[in-house]
Amino acid sequence: MAVVTMKQLLEAGVHFGHRTQRWNPKMKEYIFGARKGIYIIDLQKTSKLLEEAYNFVRDKAAEGGTILFVGTKKQAQQVIKQEAERCGAFYVNHRWLGGLLTNFQTIRKRIDKLIELEEMEANGEFDNLPKKEQSRLRRILDKLRKNLGGLKEMDRIPDVIYIVDPRKERNAVYEANLLKIPTVSIVDTNCDPDEIDYIIPGNDDAIRAIQLITSKIADAYLEGKEGVSYQEEPQEQKEENSEEIFDIEDEEESEEI
């Protein structure tokens, strides 16, 4: 069984990279060619590397490991929240707080404050306070929910971090590498693949592409925890290859790099 089909990757636009003026030369081996000033990612390599990332996350989950989903760019926020909640992962989808990993004990105190305020709200304790104090506490609560709402159950640093756009989430990547926490990430043509342990070459700007890849990482985590396969039944023949990308888009020849 395949983790993802070539058709799914194509339909989600995973193969579209950035403009040729904006690229990282380290990504050259994952690029098939260029068309109309846009790099085209080699989906054969994407498929293979996604499978490696899937197996890694699945095996970590089977060992009882935890995973943190990170994606704060607008296109990723809702997907990160939905898929993390679906598979029972932790998540950050608005703002990465400095020291979230490297100074986790301090961050944990803020998470505890969030839980305390939520309990006060649920118990009606806010209603017994002066309106000015209610307003102040609700502002604090809203801010904590936004930044830490996906971390309430995280009592230690995670075993794996999944990231959408390592350039955007460079602070998360830095902290993870500092603590030697394995990273899995969608890596577009403008990113540095050397910073990531398990790269998934792909479009990190299109919502459909982010949704597809993130859902597969969530499936891997669920499969590891539950022991039930979430992989796709084969739907297409092996001979489908990267060249077919261009037949689908138009008949112009691509520019090899």
Curated annotation (Swiss-Prot):
Residues 227-257 are annotated as: Disordered. Keywords: Ribonucleoprotein, Ribosomal protein. One of its GO terms (molecular function) is structural constituent of ribosome. PROSITE patterns: RIBOSOMAL_S2_1 (PS00962). Transmembrane segments: none annotated. InterPro entries: Ribosomal_uS2, Ribosomal_uS2_bac/mit/plastid, Ribosomal_uS2_CS, Ribosomal_uS2_flav_dom_sf. GO terms for biological process: translation. Belongs to the universal ribosomal protein uS2 family. This is Small ribosomal subunit protein uS2. The gene is rpsB.
